[in-house]
C-alpha cells in the first residue's frame, strides 16, 4: 500500500503493476540501483502474480533499452520539453510511451493509469499535462513511429563516440539495432534431469533445444522462479561458452585411461560459475 495525502485525510491505494514499475524505474534510472537487486528485496514486486511480474520485466527492460527514444517522442508534444530533474513526470511519460509505441498496449489502460499516477505523485495540474501529451501520442501514433530516432540514440554519448571511432557509423547503427533486441537465454540442463522432464521443461519455457542439453528461450521472469533452480537441475550458460569444457572433456577421455571421476581440474577465475557447473555435471572434481 502507499499513502496519498489529501487536505483532510490520508487515503490508502493498492499498488498496481504499473505503479510498482514506476517506482522501480525511478530507482533504476535516477538512483542507479540494479534491477535484479531491487526485485529481490521488493515486497510490492513479489506480491504480484506471475503474469504481472512478466509484464513488469518486459516493461522495465524495454524502458532501459529505449528510454532516450521515448523521451524524444513525448518531448515532441511538450511545448517547453520535460526537464530530466522532474523524475516522476519523466518516469510516467517514459513508461507510458513505451507501452503505447513499443508494446502496443491499449491506450485507455495506459492513459487511465498514467493520469492516476500523476495525481498521486505530482498533482492534479501535472496530471492534465500527462493526459494531454499521451493523447497526442495516441492520436499521432503513425507520425510517432515515423519520427522514432535511430536506435543508436539510446547509447551513452561516450560509448557512441568510442564505437563510431572504432567501427564506423554504419556498423554502429547495426550494433545499436541488435542491442535493442531482447537477448535470448541459454539454460543448460543437468544430467540429473530425465529426457521426459527436459522436454516438459522446454515446453514450459516455450524454448527450443539448440544442443542436447541446452534450451534457448526468451525468459520474461526471474530465473529463480523456475522449477529446479534451488535443486541445481539447470544453470544459465551461453551455448558458446560450453566449448572450452567440451574440448577439455574430449582431451581427458582421449589421453587418460583412468575413470574420469579421478581427474581433478582447477578452474581459474571461475565466476560466475557456468563452466564449473558444467565440469561438476560431468563428474569432474
Task: Please provide the spans of the model-predicted regions.
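Non-catalytic accessory regions of SAM-dependent methyltransferases
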Residues: 1-138, 148-149
Amino acid at each position: 500500500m502507499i499513502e496519498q495525502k489529501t487536505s483532510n485525510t490520508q487515503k490508502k491505494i493498492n499498488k498496481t503493476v504499473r505503479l510498482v514499475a514506476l517506482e522501480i524505474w525511478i530507482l533504476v534510472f535516477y538512483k542507479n540501483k540494479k534491477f535484479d537487486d531491487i526485485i529481490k528485496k521488493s515486497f510490492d514486486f513479489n506480491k504480484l502474480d506471475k503474469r504481472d511480474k512478466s509484464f513488469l520485466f518486459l516493461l522495465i527492460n524495454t524502458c532501459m533499452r529505449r528510454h532516450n527514444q521515448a523521451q524524444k517522442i513525448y518531448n515532441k508534444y511538450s511545448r517547453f520539453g520535460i526537464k530530466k530533474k522532474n523524475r516522476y513526470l519523466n518516469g510516467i511519460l517514459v513508461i507510458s510511451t513505451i507501452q503505447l509505441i513499443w508494446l502496443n498496449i491499449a491506450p485507455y489502460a495506459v492513459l487511465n493509469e498514467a493520469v492516476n499516477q500523476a495525481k498521486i505523485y505530482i498533482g492534479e495540474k501535472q496530471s492534465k499535462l500527462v493526459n494531454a501529451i499521451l493523447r497526442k501520442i495516441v492520436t499521432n501514433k503513425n507520425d510517432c513511429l515515423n519520427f522514432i530516432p535511430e536506435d543508436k540514440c539510446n547509447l551513452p554519448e561516450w560509448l557512441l563516440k568510442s564505437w563510431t571511432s572504432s567501427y564506423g557509423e554504419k556498423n554502429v547503427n547495426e550494433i545499436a539495432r541488435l542491442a535493442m533486441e531482447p537477448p535470448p537465454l541459454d539454460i543448460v540442463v543437468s544430467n540429473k534431469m530425465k529426457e521426459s522432464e527436459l522436454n516438459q521443461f522446454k515446453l514450459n519455457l516455450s524454448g527450443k533445444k539448440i544442443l542436447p542439453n541446452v534450451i534457448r528461450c526468451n525468459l520474461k521472469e526471474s530465473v529463480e522462479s523456475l522449477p529446479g533452480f534451488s535443486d541445481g537441475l539447470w544453470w544459465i550458460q551461453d551455448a558458446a561458452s560450453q566449448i572450452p569444457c567440451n574440448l577439455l572433456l574430449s582431451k581427458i577421455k582421449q589421453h587418460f585411461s583412468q575413470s574420469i571421476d579421478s581427474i581433478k581440474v582447477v578452474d581459474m577465475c571461475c565466476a560466475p560459475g557456468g563452466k564449473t557447473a558444467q565440469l561438476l555435471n560431468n563428474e569432474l572434481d
